[in-house]
Regions:
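Short glycine-enriched loop/turn motifs at secondary-structure junctions
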Residues: 1-3, 25, 47-50, 86
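Well-ordered alpha/beta subsegment
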Residues: 104-132
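Compact, glycine-rich, soluble single-domain proteins
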Residues: 30, 36-82
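Short Gly/charged-rich anion-binding patches and loops
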Residues: 18-19, 36, 69, 120
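Conserved active-site and cofactor/substrate-binding residues in soluble primary-metabolism enzymes
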Residues: 11, 15, 36, 112, ...
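Beta-strand/loop substructures that line and gate deep hydrophobic ligand-binding cavities in soluble
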Residues: 80-106
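Terminal, regulation- and interaction-focused segments at domain boundaries
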Residues: 1-27, 126
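Short secondary-structure transition/capping segments
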Residues: 24, 75-88, 125-132
């Protein structure tokens, strides 16, 4: 079992980003943080890097359940979703698989939450389609 779900689609980076945010919203997630690694690495290290964005996605009801089940789970929140351009109009979108990332935590209530969140994030990835 991989620690992430992933799919590569054809389309403009910005268009795919909008689609991902819409799919996340449809699954009950909000994007709390956005990190533009291309810009950050250019500004901080003066290094060129491909388009690469990290979206910190949170589903508040599930986050609340997870925090009730395990008070240190905040160290693993939010769920990261990344977009990266491997070549022109070839965009890979990946999302964390919470089932794998939370395997080390022995908590039955948390496992149920992780299964539900994993299913929703996998749905986001599976519903991505090539730009038309």
């Amino acid at each position: 079992m991989n620690y992430y779900f992933s799919k590569t689609v054809n389309g403009k980076f910005e268009t795919i980003e909008i689609k991902v945010k819409t799919l996340l919203k449809n699954e009950g997630f909000g994007v709390l943080t956005e990190i533009d690694m291309q810009t950050t690495l250019k500004e901080k290290l003066h290094k060129a890097f491909r388009k690469y964005k990290i979206l910190g996605a949170c589903n508040p009801p599930f986050a609340f359940k997870a925090l009730q089940a395990e008070d240190k789970i905040g160290t693993m929140l939010p769920c990261n979703v990344i977009l990266q351009e491997h070549s022109l109009n070839k965009i890979e979108v990946s999302a964390i698989n919470p089932m794998v990332s939370m395997q080390a935590i022995e908590n039955t209530a948390l496992k149920t939450v992780a299964q539900d969140v994993s299913s929703k994030l996998e749905n986001v990835i599976n519903k991505l389609e090539n730009e038309k």
